[in-house]
Structure formats: C-alpha cells, structure tokens
Amino acid sequence: MMLPKRNIIHFLRKRAIFIVAAFIALLTVDYSLNTIEITDSKSGPFSLNTPIEDIRLVECFSFSPFCRPVLEFWKWARTSRNLYRSRIPWKRAYLYVKRPALYIPGETVLVEQVYVDRQLEKRNKHGIQIRYGTDGDICEFNTLLGEDVVELREGWSAVLNDFIYLGQPVLLTQRPCETPPTPSIEALKRKELSSVTLTYDDEEKKTIKILQLSDLHYSNSDRPCRDPYPYETAEDCMADAKTTAFVNELLQLEEPDFVLLTGDLINGDTSRDARSSLMKAVSPFVDYNVPFAVNFGNHDDLGDLSREELAKILSQIPGSMGLIGNVSGVGNFVLHSPRKFAIYVLDTKGDTSNRRLCPGYDAITEDQLEWLSSKVADFKYEPIQMAVLHIPLKEFCETEDLVGAFREPCSYSICDPNTAKALKSLRIPLAIAGHDHVNDFCGIHPDYNTYFCFAGGAGFGGYGGHGGYVRRARVFELDPVERAVRTWKRLEWPPEDRKLMLDVQTILV
C-alpha cells in the first residue's frame, strides 16, 4: 500500500528536523567539552598536574559534529589543533588525553610509555603504541608539525622512534609530571623582573659581540626559497633548511655572546603550526648554547598563536632571555650588563587595529615611551645604550653618510608619536631594526644625531633578491671602555666570501 505524498513529505520533514536537532546537539556538546579549561590546579581530571591514564588520536570528516572518543566522551580533553590543517580539507584529526577523576599514586593505572612505530600502522592505524602501568608519570602531550621540527622546551621530550603521518609528519612530545606546567601569561608577568641582567665573568673580556638576525620567516614543511639570488642558486633551494644552514655557519664563524632576533622569525600566514615554526627558528641557538632575545615582528602572530602565546613558549626554552613586559605590546624589556650596556627592546606590533585613524602599521605608544624613559633613568650610566625595533621609524630613511645599501622605501607607522625625538632626549645614540628585508645600511640622522641601522633579511622564507640582494646578518661588537660600537655584515653567498666582513664601521656612542 502506497503512502500518500503528503504523508511522505510529513515523514521526511520530521526526520529532517530530528537529524538537524541531533546535529546541533552533538555540535554543542562537542564544543562545550572542548572549551573546558585545562588548568595547572593541584589535581583533578582537567589538571595539568594529574598523570594521564590514556591517549587517543581521533579522525573524522570535516562536517562531523562530534569528533572525539565515544567511550566516556565527557572525560577526554583535546590537546591539539586539527592535525590535518589544510593538507586534507575534508578530514580532521585531534589528539585527546584522559586523566583519572581520582588519582591514587601507585594504584591508578596510567600511561607509562608511548612510542610510535610506523611498521605497526596496519595493526594500529597511526602506529601509536602505549604501555600502561601504575608507575606512569606523563602529565602532558603535545604535537609538533614537520619533519625537521625539534622539541626544545625544558623538561619536554619527543616520544621514541617515529613520526605519526597525517598528510604530513607529526611529532608527538611529552612532559613528565616532575616538570611543572608552564604558568599562565598573568603568572609569568607577575614573576618577571624589570630587566634581564647578563654577566660576563671573564675580566679580560673587553668587547661583547652581538649577532643580529632579522626576518628569518620560518614555516612548517620546507618550502622553496623565495626570491633566491643569484638565480642559479634556486635549484633545490629549500627555505628553512637553507636559512638554518646560514645561521649555523654564522654561529660557528662569529661565536657571538648573544643573539638579537629582530622580528618575523615565523612566516605566520603560511605556518600551520606556529609553535613548531618558532622552535625550529630558535633551535640553532639552543644547539650552540648561545643566549638569545626575541623582538616580535608583524608576521609572527599571523598564524595560530598570539604574541602572548609565543612568549609563553619562549619562556620554556633554555637560553631565551626575553620578557613579556607590562606595557602595550608583548616583549618590551631591557637587556642589561653592569658597566657595559643597556639594550632597550620595544615591540612595534603589527598591522593596525584601527585603519581609519592609523592606516598601515600600528605604532609605538605613549606608555611604551614612558616605560622607556623610566628604564633609561635606571640604566643611564651604562656606557653603551641601544634601542631595538622590528618595524623602523621613518627617520631610518632620513639618515646621511650611509654605509650599506638603500634598496627599498622604508615601511613605517605614520602614527608614530615621535619616537626618534624621544631617543634623542633620552640620549640613546643607536637604534636598530629589521622588517625592510633588502635595506642593510647604517646612517646618522642630521637632526637627532642618532645612528639608525638595518640588519637586512637573513631568511629565505621571506622576500629578497631585489637589486641583487643576498641574504645577510649584522654583527655588533660593543666596546664599553672606548664607548664604541663596531659593526659589519656577513653575506650568505658566495660561500668563499662568507668570512669577509662587509661594510665595517665604528660608531662612537
């Protein structure tokens, strides 16, 4: 017996309403569970201090409203972003962990060891092998993307053997419970000192050498070099690998006392996982045991992490000397060495948030200049005073007696509150910047009597090659006794010229 057409439509409509309602309900439940805050409280199923009792990697279609383990789904906490990212747009994958509601040391069964064996993928889809027992002490798992990524955070380590493969290599990393979780941004700010003090015990050491690296533009998977020069070097030129090779050679050649990274470590708009890119960018300094400080650029926070989150990761990495700061921006701090120097790092931020009032780039703000004035009052008797920026001031390109090349117009904020005038009044005679990749000159401003210096871009992931530009880095040698700064550059190409000191000049401060 055939149902009347009206009954069929009514039946389908009821089913459609039920399906839509179920879809929305599952979506709401999934979203609510994923927004539960994982805290660093002392204990509990959503505490970073409670050992993990199980781990799962869950895959689903992009349109699926519910993408988590089904059994006891309310107990699982998501600990990764979508691991497929843009590689496979119709699929999603997440790492989940489960912690016991009641943890009894020595009795509760936990995850004791995790390793990845791609040979076992057929038996276990992702090759993840887990050993359980009552001695488990893993409190956190993370994922990093890319074949050349490394885990640098203090106390963290990669799980053994192999990568998980989800359209790209995924490195699974772990934190044992004996390593405390990273404090929140607010807690880090509360603990911060007003400056970072660098001490040099060698009494015979007369000079301090600083390597300035700017605009490295790291991503996740290795991409072809952008604008390589000379053009014959383009074949098989992979951006991140070539940048790292250049940085390693500079560290070997110069043996700097510390490294200043003046912005755009990450090519945020092409980096699917900023944490992985950031660790890759600073790994050479950890390998060579060279302290470093990061001044963020306008590209660093264009990916999936904010400046605050990037600063939080840096706080966990050995050798990182930066601070978050308590004024506008992230990363306003002083590097100070008694009787030697005071280096003032200012966050020039990125694109403006109010394009009508201030189109283009954001500006240094009045509270930053007030902070700078207060810090100069603390350290004004140090022989060498320097300011560090990413985005230059317009006065950089009003300088005279240039040593180096002026290849592109300056990119600067049109809303700057006259920072150059403040530098003059505070008697800071030298300011350095990045951002303009193919400008690499030092010059003196005729009105302010301040030296402004560009580093030039060092990374192959950002633009370059204009006017025959070869990637390079700048070196500063500070002589506190003579109150002098000697500076030069090192070129990446040709190999036989890498040991040549280009455009050597001495700046009396």
From Swiss-Prot:
Its main location: endoplasmic reticulum. Residues 1-32 form the signal peptide. Pfam families: Metallophos (PF00149). It comes from the Eukaryota. InterPro entries: Calcineurin-like_PHP_ApaH, Metallo-depent_PP-like. GO terms for biological process: endoplasmic reticulum unfolded protein response. One of its GO terms (molecular function) is phosphoprotein phosphatase activity. CDD domains: MPP_Dcr2. Keywords: Endoplasmic reticulum, Signal. GO terms for cellular component: endoplasmic reticulum. It is found in: Endoplasmic reticulum. This is Uncharacterized protein C1020.05. It comes from Schizosaccharomyces pombe (strain 972 / ATCC 24843).
